[in-house]
């Protein structure tokens, strides 16, 4: 599995990348929407998407990707805890939504779950 991590926080980005590697999952970590657009074209198996980014709003990019037909599973990871943010993320096309701080084991489980669902839907 190959994951695109879009997270502007350096400590969290490095921790996510290291944790995924320990699980045998490869990944690319980027800190901006501009960088992410280049890697989205490489079709990762899943995207971990922060909402508050230095060059824009992750939710708006999520909606744009979905409108363009980008079907790769996307898990939103954010410090925003309001119900409206969770609903907006899921309605905007996220496959899952996880608020920070979170346990890495939970993220890994959710990552496997969304990629399994995606693979099952693709085979139907």
What does each model-identified segment do?
Residues 1-122:
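N-terminal/domain-start alpha-helical segments
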């Amino acid at each position: 599995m190959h994951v695109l991590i879009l997270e502007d926080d350096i400590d969290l980005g490095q921790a996510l990348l290291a944790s995924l590697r320990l699980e045998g999952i490869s990944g690319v970590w980027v800190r901006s929407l501009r960088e992410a657009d280049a890697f989205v074209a490489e079709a990762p198996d899943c995207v971990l998407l922060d909402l508050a980014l230095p060059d824009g709003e992750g939710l708006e990019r999520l909606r744009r990707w979905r409108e363009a037909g980008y079907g790769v599973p996307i898990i939103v990871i954010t410090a925003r805890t309001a119900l409206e943010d969770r609903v907006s993320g899921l309605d905007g096309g996220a496959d899952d939504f996880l608020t920070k701080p979170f346990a890495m084991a939970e993220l890994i489980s959710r990552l496997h779950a969304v990629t399994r669902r995606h693979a099952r839907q693709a085979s139907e």
